[in-house]
A protein has these predicted regions:
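Conserved ABC ATPase "signature" region
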Residues: 91, 106-124
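Conserved ABC ATPase signature
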Residues: 103, 128-132, 136
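The feature captures the beta-strand-to-loop junction immediately N-terminal to the Walker
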Residues: 27-29
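Conserved ABC transporter NBD signature motif
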Residues: 50-58, 67
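Catalytic Walker B motif of ABC-type/P-loop ATPase nucleotide-binding domains
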Residues: 153-157
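Helix-to-loop junction immediately C-terminal to a conserved catalytic motif
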Residues: 42
Length: 323
């Protein structure tokens, strides 16, 4: 993009397609240019070179009126909206069709109600916008974009201010909407784990290597994901297709058991620098039992046993042993 004194090149050599009926997530570090790319794709700012085709037509050939009925945009900004009902805000999505006075026709009102129903916020429709939580407000903005009836919707970090359950709900909602409406939905996000589990396609944006695209699984198999996030302390687990913390282990302990208790003990020990699994050979070992048992058994080097009721007590045992 152009600034007053220079031209800033954010990314080049992008050759990719965003498809209808799919949720595509744009991932990248802070400052890499995700928002700039979204603004360019939305025609909010001019591209420096190349072409952007929307439904087979160059974006520069669209009039403002045509763009308003082709591309809907949901931004991160938290606007303070007062004295407006949710239904009225969703109705503003119909502004490209209502003319100067903005009066909703019977058909416009039907589309507004359908958009509210698609996002499942019927119980919020008569609430004042300023009384909503961040998650509820984000749903309303998505409903507004749906009411705009554009085949393409761009979202700039729609989960940025949400708690984890709300993040999951918004991501699942967007994925559901791509299937239900066959719209093209493209969003930037920092929620890596959710994007890998829910999105259909991923765009990895990196200053050094440009943009890599594909399904999360293909990017995992090709090594793009592990290379993209390669840094100390983070490891891409090829078995799960997700990232995990790369703990540095100071000792190893054999762990016997199965199910949830085994997994939770293993996780707690690894967080505390102890590699624990069934394959490890050690003089001391831990028996986790299953959910029917209420304790954990530590088999000591001396041949004796030490029983703990909680994982916290189990960790304290090894802290005491170290000291």
């Amino acid at each position: 993009y152009h600034s007053k004194s220079s031209t800033k090149l954010v990314a080049k050599g992008i050759h990719s397609t965003i498809y209808s009926g799919e949720l595509t997530c744009l991932l990248g570090a802070n400052g890499v240019g995700k928002s700039t790319l979204l603004r360019t794709l939305s025609a909010f700012q001019p591209k420096l070179d190349g072409e952007i085709l929307v439904l087979g037509k160059d974006i520069d050939a669209y009039s403002d009126k045509e763009l308003s009925t082709t591309i809907g945009v949901v931004l991160t900004d938290k606007c303070e909206i007062r004295n407006m009902l949710v239904r009225e805000l969703v109705g503003m999505g119909r502004s490209p069709y209502t003319g100067f006075w903005g009066k909703l026709s019977k058909d416009d009102k039907r589309i507004v109600e359908e958009s509210i129903a698609l996002v499942r916020i019927e119980e919020l429709a008569s609430r004042m916008v300023h009384t909503l939580s961040d998650g509820e407000r984000q749903k309303v903005m998505i409903a507004k974009a749906l009411a705009q009836e554009t085949p393409v919707i761009y979202l700039d970090e729609p989960t940025a201010f949400l708690d984890f359950p709300s993040k999951v709900e918004i991501m699942q909602l967007l994925h559901h909407l791509t299937r239900k409406t066959n719209k093209t939905i493209f969003m930037s996000t920092h929620d890596l784990e959710l994007a890998l589990q829910i999105s259909d396609k991923i765009w990895l944006m990196d200053k050094a290597n440009g943009i890599s695209t594909g399904t999360p699984e293909d990017l995992a198999l090709s090594g793009h994901l592990s290379n993209f996030f390669a840094r100390k302390g983070i490891v891409f687990d090829k078995d799960t297709g997700l990232f995990r913390i790369d703990n540095q282990f100071s000792r190893q302990i054999r762990l016997v058991g199965h199910g949830q208790k085994y997994a939770m003990v293993r996780k707690a020990l690894q967080r505390n620098g102890i590699l624990a699994n069934r394959e490890v050979e050690s003089n001391i070992w831990i028996e986790t039992g299953d959910l029917k048992t209420t304790h954990f058994i530590i088999h000591e080097t001396s041949g004796g046993t030490y029983i703990t009721q909680t994982i916290e007590e189990l960790l304290a045992y090894f802290d005491t042993e170290k000291s």
